[in-house]
C-alpha cells in the first residue's frame, strides 16, 4: 500500500487528525477561539487548510485579535483567558504550545493587538476600569504588572488599534457623542507619553456611529503595509449599514475616504465577536473574515458595490461565528529577510 493511501486509511479508521505542512509564505489565517486555521492566499472556493493549530497545549480558548510580526510569528490576544497573549512561531502546527506567553495581570477583555518593528506588543483592553492600550516590551514572558498604559482623552469606547510604517499607534473608537474617531499617537518618539499626531473624525469621513455596545468589533482598522493607506471596517450598532472605507496615508481631520467598499454585492456582513474583522495583504488586497469559515478577498483598488475577487471557504463545515483574521504576505514592510528562516 502506498504511504499516502496508508495514512488516509489510518485516519479514516481511527479518527486521527492528519498533520498539515506549514502554509506557504503568502497565507491568510482565521482565528476561532480555540484554534487557528490557515489558507493559501491563492486559494479560491472550497479549500483544505494548509495549517491548523489546535489542542490543549496551545492554551487557546478565547483567541480573537491576532497579528503577524515581521518575523512571521503569531501574536494572539485571548479575550478572556487570564489576559493572555500567546506567541507562536510561523510553522506552529497541531497541538503545539506557544513559544512564549505573557499575561497583562491588571486587566482582561483584550479586544485588539498590534506589533511594531521592534516587536513591542500593543494590546487594547476594553475593560472599563483599565480601558486603553497596554504596551509589553519585546520578548516579554510571564506576568506583566507594570505595562505602559496609553489612554486617549477623545475616546470613551475603544474598539481597534494598528501600527503604521512609522511605528506610530492608531487608536479607533467612539467619542462621547458616539461619533467614530481614529487618533494617531507618536509612539515612535515617546512610548510612555506619546504626542497626538493626527485625529481623523467628522462628517466628511463618512464613518458610521456605533457606540454603546461593549466588546464588539463594529469597527476594525488596518494599515496597508505597502502604501500606509488606512482601511476602516465600520458598521452601525444595529448592523443596518456596513462599509469599508479607505483613507489616504496619514489622513487627518474631517477628510473623506479615497474610496469605499459597500453594498449587497460585496457579501460583507456584520460582526459581533471580539477580533479583527479585516486584514490587508502586501499587494493591497482587502481580506474580510466572515462566518462559517469564509474569507472574502477584494482586489487592490476595489470600490463601491463590488463582488469579491476571491472567496476562500474551508472545506470542513465550520462554526457560524468568527473571531479574527491575520495575513502574511511577501513584499510588505512587516516582513524582511528570508521567509523560510523560521
PLM regions with names:
Residues 1-4:
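Positively charged n-region of N-terminal signal peptides that target proteins for export
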Residues 6-15:
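Bacterial N-terminal signal peptides
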Residues 21-342:
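Flexible "stalk/tail and boundary" regions
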Amino acid at each position: 500500500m502506498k504511504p499516502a493511501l496508508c495514512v488516509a486509511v489510518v485516519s479514516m479508521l481511527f479518527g486521527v487528525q492528519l498533520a498539515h505542512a506549514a502554509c506557504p509564505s503568502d497565507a491568510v489565517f482565521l482565528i476561532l477561539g480555540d484554534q487557528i486555521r490557515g489558507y493559501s492566499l491563492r486559494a479560491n472556493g472550497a479549500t483544505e487548510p494548509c495549517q491548523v493549530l489546535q489542542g490543549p497545549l496551545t492554551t487557546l480558548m478565547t483567541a480573537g485579535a491576532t497579528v503577524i510580526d515581521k518575523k512571521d510569528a503569531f501574536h494572539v490576544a485571548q479575550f478572556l483567558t487570564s489576559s493572555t497573549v500567546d506567541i507562536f512561531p510561523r510553522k506552529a502546527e497541531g497541538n503545539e504550545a506557544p513559544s512564549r506567553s505573557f499575561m497583562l495581570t491588571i486587566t482582561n477583555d483584550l479586544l485588539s493587538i498590534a506589533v511594531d518593528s521592534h516587536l513591542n506588543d500593543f494590546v487594547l483592553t476594553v475593560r472599563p476600569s483599565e480601558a486603553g492600550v497596554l504596551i509589553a516590551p519585546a520578548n516579554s514572558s510571564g506576568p506583566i504588572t507594570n505595562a505602559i498604559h496609553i489612554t486617549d482623552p477623545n475616546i470613551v469606547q475603544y474598539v481597534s488599534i494598528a501600527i503604521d510604517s512609522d511605528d506610530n499607534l492608531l487608536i479607533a473608537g467612539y467619542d462621547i457623542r458616539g461619533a467614530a474617531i481614529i487618533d494617531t499617537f507618536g509612539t515612535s518618539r515617546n512610548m510612555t507619553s506619546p504626542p497626538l499626531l493626527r485625529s481623523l473624525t467628522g462628517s466628511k469621513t463618512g464613518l458610521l456611529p456605533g457606540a454603546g455596545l461593549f466588546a464588539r468589533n463594529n469597527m476594525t482598522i488596518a494599515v496597508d503595509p505597502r502604501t500606509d493607506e488606512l482601511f476602516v471596517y465600520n458598521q452601525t450598532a444595529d448592523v443596518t449599514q456596513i462599509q469599508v472605507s479607505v483613507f489616504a496615508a496619514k489622513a487627518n481631520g474631517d477628510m473623506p475616504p479615497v474610496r469605499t467598499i459597500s453594498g449587497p454585492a460585496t457579501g460583507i456582513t456584520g460582526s459581533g465577536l471580539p477580533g479583527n474583522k479585516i486584514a490587508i495583504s502586501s499587494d493591497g488586497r482587502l481580506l474580510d473574515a466572515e462566518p462559517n469559515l469564509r474569507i472574502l478577498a477584494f482586489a487592490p483598488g476595489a470600490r463601491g458595490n463590488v463582488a469579491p475577487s476571491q472567496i476562500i471557504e474551508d472545506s470542513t463545515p465550520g462554526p457560524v461565528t468568527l473571531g479574527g483574521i491575520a495575513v502574511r504576505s511577501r513584499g510588505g514592510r512587516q516582513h524582511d529577510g528570508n521567509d523560510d528562516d523560521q
